[in-house]
Amino acid sequence: LARSNKDSSLGYKGLSLFLVEKPSFSGHDFKHPQTDGGLLTGKAIATIGYRGMHSYDLFFEDFLVPAENLVGEEAGEGKGFYFTMAGFAGGRIQTAARATGLMQAAFERALSYAKDRKVFGSIIADYQLTQIKLARLLATLTAARQFSYAVAELMDDGAGQMEASLVKLFSCRAAEMLCREALQIHGGMGYAEESAVSRLFVDARVLSIFEGAEEVLAIKVVARELIEESS
């Protein structure tokens, strides 16, 4: 996303999207020099979780991008902001789906551990407190999954823009809670890096931040549409 019009008074209407090509690479940083002297460099931003997918700091130094790389061709000039915004709803429903998958993995591991770990002569799955926790976790997981399916159907019909934000708000916060309780069922082993649930716990934290922080979604999307529809 770059400014393609020198007139700064245009604001976001002066932004366009371009495809930038580079070769594939291994590792967490790269340099891509151009024959005419331009240089693109990138370095992965270290994070506490979600290590299978990285965000990068990118630096463009006299890097040339051909005009034919403009997304939308000539009609796409000045439409970069609109193209970006158009993808947000899809990103939010798929983030809710990610949260559901993460919850499923955490629940399965908590259930398996509860059936295997013995405390005071009994597996912890036999204790009522553990049973209550497992039931609540499954209820939360099921609610998030069915909510996601319902919103996905709305979006298939061309609707559900606000609902995409709602399901992200619910599912991502639910994933944080569920993974916390799944880790708690594991006890001290849940805090060990060798335990998969520790990774799920850390990964869940970022879900309510990317694809629209929950505070922004609540104020700028959900509340705004609710107020407009009620007036």
Regions found by a protein language model. Name each.
Residues 26-62:
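Flexible, small-/acidic-enriched active-site or ligand-binding loops
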Residues 2-5, 20-23, 61-63, 68, ...:
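Fold-independent oxyanion-binding glycine-rich loops
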Residues 1-38:
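A short core secondary-structure module
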Residues 44-48, 74, 111, 119:
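Glycine-anchored helix-breaking recognition loops at helix->coil/strand junctions
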Residues 29, 69-75:
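Cytochrome P450 core scaffold surrounding the K-helix E-X-X-R motif
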Residues 57-59, 63, 78, 86-231:
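Alpha-helical interface subdomain recognition
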